[in-house]
Amino acid sequence: MFLCTRQIDIHARFGIQRIAFLSLVATIFTFLVSYEVMYYFLDTPLSDRNFFVLIVFILLMYPIHKIVHLLFFLPYYKSFKIHKLSSKKWVPYFNTYVNTPVHKIYFCINLILPIFFLSGIFIMLSIYLPQYGHYFMFLLSLNIGCSMMDILYLKILLFSNDGHYVEEHQSGLHILNKVDNPYTQH
């Protein structure tokens, strides 16, 4: 049996405007820094060929980010829930979450997994295909921008001493403690 010790709603705590602003600033800052680092180490001339492939990957960045989260939660696939965040039919903006208690450490690893996994892929691709390094650095910065909400949740979870389990809901996270049910017979 689990008891909720704390509820976290990032939207109510920070607000959509602040989260969007933090995401935009993180994206711009990450691109400026990563591009300068890449430009310092690589001496290959940059190419603007295959620009439409970049546009496709820009549009797919959010779904790819979500898929990386869901792949790590594959042991909990029976508890996957999908909630459409946009009322417009043509906007594919979904919130996917696991509706079962997950250990806090496992959940924290899942929060940072897309940051390290996708960033590592983009850095490796910029090393192996240096002529498109600026494309990969832009995709890396978009990934960091998409991860801003994950970083905010991670910060709150790491500094929370309340419980050892986390359960996701449409409204945010619930931090839970596992307790023995006093009404069960031994």
Predicted regions located by residue number:
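Metalloprotease/metallohydrolase-associated module, dominated by Zn2+-dependent proteases
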Residues: 1-38, 89-176
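Hydrophobic alpha-helical transmembrane segments
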Residues: 35, 179-186
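Loop-to-helix transition at the N-terminal end of transmembrane alpha-helices
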Residues: 44-59
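Alpha-helical transmembrane segments
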Residues: 57-61, 144-147
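Active-site recognition of the HExxH zinc-binding catalytic motif
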Residues: 61-74, 114
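Hydrophobic, membrane-facing alpha-helical anchors
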Residues: 62-67, 86-95
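Catalytic Zn2+-binding segment of zinc metalloproteases
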Residues: 69-82, 159-160
